[in-house]
């Protein structure tokens, strides 16, 4: 097999990054305020011979982000980048999602009095402008939506004790993102999170990946040689969907273990909260690709357990960053529900979902339900909606609550809608029809035989 034989970790818990219209890393990450960000200033030239403070691990410094704003950042780790021949520091921007953590050169840290004074002066001017603005009050619901959209990280104090303990343990294990970039196909992509690539691979600033077999390499020379030798031009497994240039392959983790392990290592670079397993055999992977004359190029995927005791129809879901905001995330979500319909079951993504995953699922659920409510005439229950869509009743209730379309009356949830309210929601860009939809006619798939037997007994 063309992919690597090293034992790798597999993602088994949803932390979906599906990427439909949500901000990318670094966008809208600061709390709402004036258009000009605090701390935006062209770095002044330090006086000749002006001493710099020594950078120490665990200390906090002002750091210039890629958008030229300055923020407090804790230095987590340092390294010598052998590929670039320079010293770098791994920083976490205080109060921001860990997705934005990055390796920076020393010249992006405010280490002299001249630079620190200039940043401080600019920040004070920003705060003065902010104080002159009319006071705005926001509701708890508005704050929740704001925090989801802008990736505001919860503090440990805002979590229950068990969650806080797990978060601290998770953060300690995955604190430093050594692999900073990957090259795959025609794209060079910044990594978002730590991924447990084995041995020396996990400490390289950059990895090269074959987009067909997903073999990962430390050196560009090895990568170029591999491209000339690799015979793969599509994922392994069975093609179960093809429409125009969109294709989906079903890959059994038991039959294609190394490919699926490599896929999970790739996905972990863009997914934070996951439980990692070494065994991919209990999972089936659905690989979404764009097809051209060169081959089938991986766009994203979702995985699901062959047997889910909790009724989950998705374990992990990801759209690779270059393909986000193009409708592929909602396509993957819709595809998972098409499979559930063929299985005559209801399903829900495994929790926890990432912030971006929550936004995409909520947007998809809202659109599906609004489309039904707009065209339906007569009496309709939440159970009816669940049977029609394969969405769980709990997910339907939470979605309708977010749309102010359900009330709790006499011990049960009651749908309360008007045609006008439905149309108003459908006019919103947030709930518009996805640009790419699943054509069930093009889906060539049936549930496994053991599941068909179970369904026939129900």
From Swiss-Prot:
What the entry lists under PROSITE patterns is as follows: MYST_HAT
Question: So which tissues is this one expressed in?
Answer: During oocyte development, expressed in both oocytes and granulosa cells.
The membrane spanning regions, by residue number, are none
Protein name from the UniProt record = Histone acetyltransferase KAT8
Q: Offer one Pfam family short name for this entry.
A: zf-MYST
Q: Which organism is it from?
A: Mus musculus (Mouse)
Q: Which family does it belong to?
A: Belongs to the MYST (SAS/MOZ) family.
Q: Where does acetyl-CoA bind?
A: 317, 319, 325-327, 329-330, 354, 363, 408, 432
- Biased composition of type Low complexity is found at 1-17, 25-35
Domain MYST-type HAT: residue ranges: 174-447
Q: What does this protein do?
A: Histone acetyltransferase that catalyzes histone H4 acetylation at 'Lys-5'- and 'Lys-8' (H4K5ac and H4K8ac) or 'Lys-16' (H4K16ac), depending on the context. Catalytic component of the MSL histone acetyltransferase complex, a multiprotein complex that mediates the majority of histone H4 acetylation at 'Lys-16' (H4K16ac), an epigenetic mark that prevents chromatin compaction. H4K16ac constitutes the only acetylation mark intergenerationally transmitted and regulates key biological processes, such as oogenesis, embryonic stem cell pluripotency, hematopoiesis or glucose metabolism.
Under SUPFAM superfamilies, the record lists: Acyl-CoA N-acyltransferases (Nat), Chromo domain-like
Give the residue ranges for region: Sufficient for interaction with KANSL1: 174-458
Query: What would be the name of the gene that encodes this protein?
Result: Kat8
What Gene Ontology cellular-component terms does the record carry?
Answer: chromosome; histone acetyltransferase complex; kinetochore; mitochondrion; MLL1 complex; MSL complex; NSL complex; nuclear matrix
Its subunit composition reads: Component of a multisubunit histone acetyltransferase complex (MSL) at least composed of the MOF/KAT8, MSL1/hampin, MSL2L1 and MSL3L1. Component of the NSL complex at least composed of MOF/KAT8, KANSL1, KANSL2, KANSL3, MCRS1, PHF20, OGT1/OGT, WDR5 and HCFC1. Component of some MLL1/MLL complex, at least composed of the core components KMT2A/MLL1, ASH2L, HCFC1, WDR5 and RBBP5, as well as the facultative components BACC1, CHD8, E2F6, HSP70, INO80C, KANSL1, LAS1L, MAX, MCRS1, MGA, MOF/KAT8, PELP1, PHF20, PRP31, RING2, RUVB1/TIP49A, RUVB2/TIP49B, SENP3, TAF1, TAF4, TAF6, TAF7, TAF9 and TEX10.
Q: Which reaction does it catalyse?
A: L-lysyl-[histone] + acetyl-CoA = N(6)-acetyl-L-lysyl-[histone] + CoA + H(+); L-lysyl-[protein] + acetyl-CoA = N(6)-acetyl-L-lysyl-[protein] + CoA + H(+); propanoyl-CoA + L-lysyl-[protein] = N(6)-propanoyl-L-lysyl-[protein] + CoA + H(+)
User: Which GO BP terms, alphabetically?
Assistant: dosage compensation by inactivation of X chromosome; myeloid cell differentiation; negative regulation of DNA-templated transcription; negative regulation of epithelial to mesenchymal transition; negative regulation of type I interferon production; neurogenesis; oogenesis; positive regulation of DNA-templated transcription
Q: How is it modified after translation?
A: Acetylation at Lys-274 facilitates cognate substrate Lys-binding and acetylation. Although considered as an autoacetylation event, acetylation at Lys-274 probably takes place via a non-enzymatic process following acetyl-CoA-binding, which primes KAT8 for cognate protein-lysine acetylation.
């Amino acid at each position: 097999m063309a992919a690597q034989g090293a034992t790798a970790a597999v993602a088994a818990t949803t932390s979906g990054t599906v990427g439909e219209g949500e901000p990318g890393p670094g966008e809208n990450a600061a709390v709402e305020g004036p258009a000009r960000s605090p701390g935006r200033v062209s770095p002044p030239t330090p006086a000749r011979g002006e001493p710099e403070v020594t950078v120490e691990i665990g200390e906090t410094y002002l750091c210039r982000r890629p958008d030229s704003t300055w923020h407090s950042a804790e230095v987590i780790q340092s390294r010598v980048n052998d590929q670039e021949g320079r010293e770098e520091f791994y920083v976490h921007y205080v109060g921001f999602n860990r997705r934005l953590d990055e390796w920076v050169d020393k010249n992006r840290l405010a280490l002299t009095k001249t630079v620190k004074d200039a940043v401080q002066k600019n920040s004070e001017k920003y705060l003065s402008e902010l104080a002159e603005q009319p006071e705005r009050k926001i509701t708890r619901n508005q704050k929740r939506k704001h925090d989801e959209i802008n990736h505001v990280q919860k503090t440990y104090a805002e979590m229950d004790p068990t969650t806080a303990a797990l978060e601290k343990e998770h953060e300690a294990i995955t604190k430093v993102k050594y692999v900073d970039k990957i090259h795959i196909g025609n794209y060079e992509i910044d990594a978002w999170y730590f991924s447990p690539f084995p041995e020396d691979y996990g400490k390289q600033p950059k990895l090269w990946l074959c987009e067909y077999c997903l073999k990962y390499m430390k050196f560009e020379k090895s990568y170029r040689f591999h491209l000339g030798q690799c015979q793969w031009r599509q994922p392994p497994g069975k093609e179960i969907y093809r429409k125009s240039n969109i294709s989906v392959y079903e890959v059994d983790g038991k039959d294609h273990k190394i490919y699926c392990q490599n896929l999970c290592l790739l996905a972990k670079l863009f997914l934070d909260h996951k439980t990692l397993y070494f065994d991919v055999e209990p999972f089936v992977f659905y690989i979404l690709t764009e097809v051209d004359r060169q081959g089938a190029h991986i766009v994203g995927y979702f995985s699901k357990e062959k047997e889910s005791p909790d009724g989950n129809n998705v374990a992990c879901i990801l759209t690779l960053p270059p393909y986000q905001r193009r409708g592929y995330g909602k396509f993957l979500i819709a595809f998972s529900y098409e499979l559930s319909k063929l299985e005559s079951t209801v399903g829900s993504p495994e929790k926890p979902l990432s912030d971006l995953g929550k936004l995409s699922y909520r947007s998809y659920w809202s659109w599906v339900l609004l489309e039904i409510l707009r065209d339906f005439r007569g009496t309709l229950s939440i159970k009816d909606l669940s049977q029609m869509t394969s969405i769980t009743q709990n997910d339907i209730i939470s979605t309708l609550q977010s749309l102010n379309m359900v009330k709790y009356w006499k011990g049960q949830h009651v749908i309360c809608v008007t045609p006008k309210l439905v149309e108003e929601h459908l006019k919103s860009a947030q709930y518009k029809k996805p640009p790419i939809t699943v054509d069930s006619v093009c889906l060539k798939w049936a549930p496994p035989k053991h599941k068909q037997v179970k369904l026939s007994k129900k």
